[in-house]
Every structure is written in C-alpha cells, then in structure tokens.
C-alpha cells in the first residue's frame, strides 16, 4: 500500500498515519526524517543535502525526489510506504510521476479552518512536565493552572491564533492545488485512488473511514 496523506496542520494526520502504518506494516516517510537520515548515513545525496542546508539554502526538488527514490527502494518499503507532508508542491508531485513512483491512494483529511484554529489555539502546556490541556476539550481544574503542580500554563508560540492562521494560509496556497492534481490524475489514470475524509468526529470513526478508503 503506497499512500500519500494530505491535511492541514491540526487535521489529525499524525494520529491516522500511525493507524495506517500499523495496519499495513509500512513505514511513515517524511522528508525531514529522510533528509536527517541521509545526512547521518553520509550517503552521496545526504552529503549534497548537508552542504545546501549548512549554507542556509533550500534543498531542491530534484534532490528530494532522488532521496525519495533511494528511500523507497529500501527493504522496509517492499509492502509500501506512507508519505507524510510530501509532496508539498505541484512540481514535486509532477516529478514523482515522472520518476515512475507509483501510488495506490491519496487520502485528504479535511477539517474546516475555524475548527483547526479552535483545536490548536486552545492548547495550553505545562512546560516542565509536557502536560497538555485544552481550554475547551480538556480544561485544567483551575483555569490557567496545571492540575498537579498549580504552575501557570502557557500557550506555545506555534499555537497562537495568528500563527495557526498563517500556517493554514500557506497550506491552502501550497497544498490545496495538490488535491486538484491528484483528483485529475485519478480521473485520467484510475490511480491513485483519491479519498476526501472529513476529519471531525471520534478518532475511531475517522480511522474506520480512512481504512475503508484504503481497502
């Protein structure tokens, strides 16, 4: 099973990725992990990527695609793989097709922006322990205070409404076109199968829909 999982930050991709990889016995591949592994292993591509990143540059799509091909040729990918956060752009998606990388399914977990803003902007954290609360879904016993220590809870910079809305706008401008790309590819070639799954409701219900889409 060769899957791409799409969805905005906060849509619940990480949770669903875990279920998919366990169910099909496939690795989850993110470009960040892949780059770090290649750099650490000191492969030819890893060394090129390291020199680009060390100089503050962005790793080119060509290099990313070659890393992907190298990664998916490894033994643990023989039953498939799950791409997480890749491809991010149309050129990357087109390059995957050109490189002959076959895909079985593209699953988009769709959640309205306002729901995502509420999910993320409501998070509060106890920094010392890592305990996470939510103002609506999992509030502390005393507002703004950790249940165990009584310390103040904080909102991470990444979780502020302004930051979340910015990340969502980047997602819509970059990744939404991918949805159209894969819908058209699916209509033209019959593959990969494209599924749009509403990411609201219980985790179990969403997982059931995702697994059904992949069956």
From Swiss-Prot:
Residues where AMP binds: 31, 36, 57-59, 85-88, 92, 156, 167
Q: In which pathway does it act?
A: Purine metabolism; AMP biosynthesis via salvage pathway; AMP from ADP: step 1/1
Question: Can the keyword Ribonucleoprotein be found in this entry's annotation?
Answer: no
Which GO cellular component does the record give, naming just one? cytoplasm
Q: Coiled-coil segments, which residues?
A: none
State the Gene Ontology BP annotations: AMP salvage
User: Which parts of the sequence are annotated with region: NMP?
Assistant: 30-59
| Catalytic activity as recorded in UniProt | AMP + ATP = 2 ADP
What GO MF annotations does this protein's record show?
adenylate kinase activity; ATP binding
Report quaternary structure and partners: Monomer.
Which family does this protein fall into? Answer: Belongs to the adenylate kinase family.
Please identify the protein, giving its name as recorded: Adenylate kinase
Q: Which organism is it from?
A: Pseudomonas fluorescens (strain SBW25)
């Amino acid at each position: 099973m060769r899957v791409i999982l799409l969805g905005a930050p906060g849509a619940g991709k990480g949770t669903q990725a875990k279920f998919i990889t366990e169910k099909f016995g496939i690795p989850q591949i993110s470009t960040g992990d892949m780059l770090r592994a290649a750099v650490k292993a000191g492969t030819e591509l890893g060394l090129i990527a390291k020199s680009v990143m060390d100089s503050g540059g962005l790793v080119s799509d060509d290099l990313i695609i070659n890393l992907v091909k190298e990664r998916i040729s490894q033994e643990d990918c023989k039953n498939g793989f799950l791409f997480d956060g890749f491809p991010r752009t149309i050129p990357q998606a087109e390059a995957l097709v050109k490189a002959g990388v076959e895909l079985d399914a593209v699953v988009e977990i769709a959640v309205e922006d306002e729901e995502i803003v509420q999910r993320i902007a409501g998070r509060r954290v106890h920094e010392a322990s890592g305990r996470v609360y939510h103002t609506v879904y999992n509030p502390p016993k005393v507002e703004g205070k950790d249940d165990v220590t009584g310390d103040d809870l904080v909102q991470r910079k990444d979780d502020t409404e302004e930051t979340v809305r910015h990340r969502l706008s980047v997602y819509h401008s970059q990744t939404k076109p991918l949805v159209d790309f894969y819908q058209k590819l699916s209509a033209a070639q019959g593959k990969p199968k494209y599924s749009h799954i509403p990411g609201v409701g219980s985790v179990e219900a969403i997982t059931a829909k995702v697994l059904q889409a992949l069956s």
